[in-house]
UniProtKB/Swiss-Prot annotation:
<keyword id="KW-0762">Sugar transport</keyword>
<dbReference type="GO" id="GO:0070062">
    <property type="term" value="C:extracellular exosome"/>
</dbReference>
<feature type="topological domain" description="Extracellular">
    <location>
        <begin position="218"/>
        <end position="275"/>
    </location>
</feature>
<keyword id="KW-0812">Transmembrane</keyword>
<feature type="topological domain" description="Extracellular">
    <location>
        <begin position="332"/>
        <end position="375"/>
    </location>
</feature>
<feature type="topological domain" description="Cytoplasmic">
    <location>
        <begin position="115"/>
        <end position="136"/>
    </location>
</feature>
<keyword id="KW-1133">Transmembrane helix</keyword>
<feature type="binding site">
    <location>
        <position position="392"/>
    </location>
    <ligand>
        <name>Na(+)</name>
    </ligand>
</feature>
<feature type="topological domain" description="Cytoplasmic">
    <location>
        <begin position="478"/>
        <end position="482"/>
    </location>
</feature>
<dbReference type="GO" id="GO:0055056">
    <property type="term" value="F:D-glucose transmembrane transporter activity"/>
</dbReference>
<dbReference type="GO" id="GO:0005886">
    <property type="term" value="C:plasma membrane"/>
</dbReference>
<feature type="transmembrane region" description="Helical; Name=TM10">
    <location>
        <begin position="452"/>
        <end position="477"/>
    </location>
</feature>
<feature type="binding site">
    <location>
        <position position="76"/>
    </location>
    <ligand>
        <name>Na(+)</name>
    </ligand>
</feature>
<dbReference type="InterPro" id="IPR018212">
    <property type="entry name" value="Na/solute_symporter_CS"/>
</dbReference>
<dbReference type="GO" id="GO:0008645">
    <property type="term" value="P:hexose transmembrane transport"/>
</dbReference>
<feature type="topological domain" description="Cytoplasmic">
    <location>
        <begin position="407"/>
        <end position="424"/>
    </location>
</feature>
<feature type="topological domain" description="Extracellular">
    <location>
        <begin position="506"/>
        <end position="523"/>
    </location>
</feature>
Amino acid sequence: MEEHTEAGSAPEMGAQKALIDNPADILVIAAYFLLVIGVGLWSMCRTNRGTVGGYFLAGRSMVWWPVGASLFASNIGSGHFVGLAGTGAASGLAVAGFEWNALFVVLLLGWLFAPVYLTAGVITMPQYLRKRFGGRRIRLYLSVLSLFLYIFTKISVDMFSGAVFIQQALGWNIYASVIALLGITMIYTVTGGLAALMYTDTVQTFVILGGACILMGYAFHEVGGYSGLFDKYLGAATSLTVSEDPAVGNISSFCYRPRPDSYHLLRHPVTGDLPWPALLLGLTIVSGWYWCSDQVIVQRCLAGKSLTHIKAGCILCGYLKLTPMFLMVMPGMISRILYPDEVACVVPEVCRRVCGTEVGCSNIAYPRLVVKLMPNGLRGLMLAVMLAALMSSLASIFNSSSTLFTMDIYTRLRPRAGDRELLLVGRLWVVFIVVVSVAWLPVVQAAQGGQLFDYIQAVSSYLAPPVSAVFVLALFVPRVNEQGAFWGLIGGLLMGLARLIPEFSFGSGSCVQPSACPAFLCGVHYLYFAIVLFFCSGLLTLTVSLCTAPIPRKHLHRLVFSLRHSKEEREDLDADEQQGSSLPVQNGCPESAMEMNEPQAPAPSLFRQCLLWFCGMSRGGVGSPPPLTQEEAAAAARRLEDISEDPSWARVVNLNALLMMAVAVFLWGFYA
C-alpha cells in the first residue's frame, strides 16, 4: 500500500490551467474561426438552401469524399477526445473496440440500408417507417424518442466534454465560452443547411486529424515511443492512496492499479469490464442503431449524389475510424503514465481538488496532454481541433433534429404548411435547441464526469436495441407489419426503462464507493442487456406480426431489401394523408413540387432581401433557378430515388470494402 501524501500537496485544479493568452495561440484560433465562417459563407452562395431538399439533404449533390469526411466528423465529437482518452487512461485499449466495430457496421449502411432508404424516397428515418408500415404512431414515437436522445444525451456529452477541455486548458468562463461556441455553430447551421455542414465538416476533419496527429507525436516522444507506452502503462499508479475520510481509509490496489488485461481488446466474458461477446455482438446491435437508422448519420448518406458515392463515403469513414485508437486511446494511456497523481487519482477528496468530481479524473487525460506538452501556437491548434469536434457534432444534431421536428412533427400539426413556413420553423427549432442546450449546462456541469462516457453508452444500450430490431425486420422481413413493429417498440421500451430507471436512481458508483443497485437489476453488463433486449423486441415484433394481417405486396415495392429493384407501381400506405396534404416531399418528390400558390407580394426592401438571402429563404432574383415543370419535377424525383451503379466503379468500391475489412480483421486479431 502506498503512503498517503499530505492532502495539501495534492495537485490543485486551478494551479494547472494554461491560459491561451499568447499571440501565436490567439492567431491560430482566429484563423480557424475565419476559415470555418468563410467556408460556411461560400457554401451559402453556391448551394440551394431555399428548398426543403436543398436545406435538409444538400440536394443529393455531394460526392464521396465530403460524405465520408462528414460521416466521420459528425461521429467524432469532443466526447470522443475526452471520453476515449479518459477510458483509455482508466482501463486500456478495449474502448477502441467501440470505434473499430463501426468499420463493419458502416458498410452495412452503405450496402444494405442506404439503397432501401433511397428507393423509398425519404428524408427522415421515422418517415421511412411511416411508408413501410403506415399509421402515425411509430413515426411519432421515433421522432420524439430521437429528439429526447439528441437533447439530453448527445448534447449533454458534447457540452460536458467541451466544458472539461475549456476548464483544464483555458480557464475561461464556461458559460460565456460555450454560449459563444453555440452561437457560431447556430449561425452557419441556420443559414447554410446541410451543404454548409458537410463542407465545414470536411474542413474540420482535416483540422481534427492534423492536430490530433501532432499531439500523438509529442505524447509518444515524451513516453519513449510505442514500446515505452507498453512498458510503462501497467506501472502507472497514483501515489495518493489513503483517504482522510475514515469511511474510505486505505484504498485497495485493485482500484488504482491498471487492469492486467489493459493491452487486450477482447476480455474475459464474465470478469472483463468490456466482455468480448458483449463487445462483438451487443455493441454491433447498438452501433447498428447509430450508423444505420440514426438521423444524424443516415442524413449524410442520403445526400450522396449516387449509391456508388455513398458506398465510397462509407469506406472512407471506415478507414478514418481506424485512427481513434492511435490518436485518442493511446494518448490517454500515455497521459496516465506522465501524470498519474492527476489522471489516475483515486482518493475522492484529491480528485475533487484536481478536476472537481470525486469519482475520478481520467476525463482530463487529453486536456492535460495539450496543456503540458504542446508549445504556443500548437496549443491553439489543439483548441481549434476541440472546437471543431464540438461544433461539428452540435451542428449535426441541430440540423438533424430540425429535420425531424419539421418533417415528422410540425407537418402533423400544420399539414398544409408551405415550403417557406417549413424552412422558417426548421430554423426556429435550431434556435430553440440552442436555448435548451444552454439551460442544460448546469445539469451537465454538476454530473459526475467519471460516469458520463459510460452513461451515454448505457442509455443507448437500454433504448436503442428495440429500434435496431424494428429497422432490421422492416428492411429484411416483408411479413412484419405495423402492429408488430409498434408493440415491439413499446415492449422493448418498457424492458429498457425497467433497467435504466433503477440503475440511474442508485447511481453507477465507483471502485472506491460501489453502487447500491441490487445485482439482479444492475449486475448484467449493459451490452449483454442490449443483446437480450434486441432479441426480445424482435421476437415480440415477429409474434404480433404473424398473429395479425400481413401488408399486401403492392405496398412494399422498393421499401424492403428484396424488392429494392422492383419497377412496379407502389401504393403508399400513407397515400391518403399525402393526397390531403400539399406536401409531396413526404412521398419523396423534389422540393420544387412543394411550392404553394401564394398571392403576389410587393417587392421587399433591400434590407429584407439581404435578410432573406442570409436565411436561405429568398425567392427569385439573380441566380435563382426557375421553377420546375411537372415533368421536370417527376424526373428529379426519379433521380433522387435512383440506385443504379456503373459496374466498373461498383467493383472498385466492393474491392475496397473487402480490403478495409481485411485490415480491420488484422488489427482486431493483433490487439485481441
